[in-house]
Amino acid sequence: VKDNDIELIINCAAYTNVDKAEDDAEFAETLNSDAVRNLAEAIKDNDGTLIHISTDYVFGKEPYNVPCREDQKGTPTGVYGMTKLHGEQAIAASGVKSLIFRTAWLYSEYGKNFVKTMLSLTSTKPTLKVVFDQTGTPTYAQDLADTIFDIIENRRYKDNEGIYHYSNEGVCSWYDFTKMIAEIAGNDTCDIQPCHSDEFPSKVTRPSYSVLDKTKIKETFGIKVPYWTDSLKTCIKNIKANEA
């Protein structure tokens, strides 16, 4: 970075295995905080801007019951959320020009993610239990990427530093999400049943309500955010096309 006239860095790299992070805290801190600090300091020397992807996990398990705003204090309950918060704090402490995009329930056509897993399970399992007491909003990675690149291409990041929330519009539980995945895919032979989170013990307490307030990003950049079911239909259509 320092040897080249780089004006902008988009950092999508992160340690994202929430449960494994509990046993690998040092490496999670290295990727989610120390590496972010290094990027921030490097691009600052070029008088450039750092765009960084963060997460709803910085808020922890507080029972907000209203969409989380950018200025709400984070109280992470696990290593993953804490190290991501440390990354945000490292950016702020560096003084670098930056935009931080917090997102949630991210999925796409690629890699391992909830949508692809549920597509497989609902097409092969006769019954499936999915938690209904965790609420949020799915985010199609393509929508997030399009938003970020629109901001970059129009150079609107120059005068609009800060933290922004982005997810698709709407609210659902993981159970609702799974039901919609199966419906769109035509996987109607699987009996999808709602259950409590305590039926799936985990090392980390997941946020019970992680809906993100997107007022700031919509008003600042004038963007329109797609509804989560519309984006899910697009993603599943693309997944099926890739498999054909």
Regions found by a protein language model. Name each.
Residues 30, 35-38, 58-101, 105-106:
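Catalytic helix-loop patch of NAD(P)-dependent Rossmann-fold dehydrogenases
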Residues 1-31, 44:
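NAD(P)H-binding glycine-rich loop region in Rossmannoid oxidoreductase-like domains
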Residues 89-136, 141-145, 149-150:
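NAD(P)-dependent short-chain dehydrogenase/reductase
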Residues 228-244:
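Amphipathic terminal alpha-helices
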Residues 45-49:
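A short helix->loop->beta-strand "cap" motif at the edges of active sites that frequently abuts
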Residues 9-13, 50-56, 101-103:
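SDR active-site strand-loop-helix element
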Residues 147, 154-203, 243-244:
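Mid/C-terminal beta-alpha module of Rossmann-like enzyme folds, strongest
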Residues 19-26, 61-68, 111-112:
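Conserved catalytic-core motifs of eukaryotic protein kinase domains, centered on the activation segment
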